[in-house]
Amino acid sequence: MFCKHLSFVAITICFLLVLAKTENEIQQKNIKFDQRTWRNMRSNGYLALPRQGRSDNQPDYTCCGMPLTKYVGICPIGMECCPGLKKVLQKSGQRTIYSVCVADAY
């Protein structure tokens, strides 16, 4: 009888130790994931501030804005530049011509 109870207790202790070890590993992986995610967000310029300066509404596509980088901001055909910007035609390669809106001061 004592032997049966001892084996049950031993199995229960082993199970609890494995469960605790697994839980600890999961927490460590989550911490590593959070650190990696935070590092990636920082390197991409994301400040992790709650939607400051952003609108919940859909963006207004009635005019073409100024590009933030060299490859972003190509205006679709027929769309005019937003106020304070002027349309500049640029050439890429031999046959590709596209329009970009830049500040009127340039």
Curated annotation (Swiss-Prot):
State the tissue distribution.
Expression is seen in the peripheral and central nervous systems in tissues such as the brain, the inferior buccal ganglion, the gastric ganglion, the olfactory lobe, the peduncle lobe and the optic lobe. Expression in the brain is distributed in the median inferior frontal lobe, the superior buccal lobe, the prebranchial lobe and the pedal lobe. Not expressed in the vasomotor lobe or the palliovisceral lobe that controls the cardiac system.
Q: Which residues form the propeptide?
A: 21-41, 55-106
Q: Which UniProt keywords apply?
A: Amidation, Cleavage on pair of basic residues, Neuropeptide, Secreted, Signal
Superkingdom, natural source = Eukaryota
A GO CC term assigned to this protein in UniProt? extracellular region
* One BP term from GO: neuropeptide signaling pathway
Q: What is its main location?
A: secreted
Q: What does this protein do?
A: Evokes contractions in the radula protractor muscle, and may regulate feeding behavior and gut motility by controlling muscle contraction of the buccal mass.
For this chain, the family text in UniProt reads: Belongs to the SCP family.
Q: What is the protein name stated in its UniProt record? A: Small cardioactive peptide-related peptide
Source organism of this protein record: Octopus vulgaris
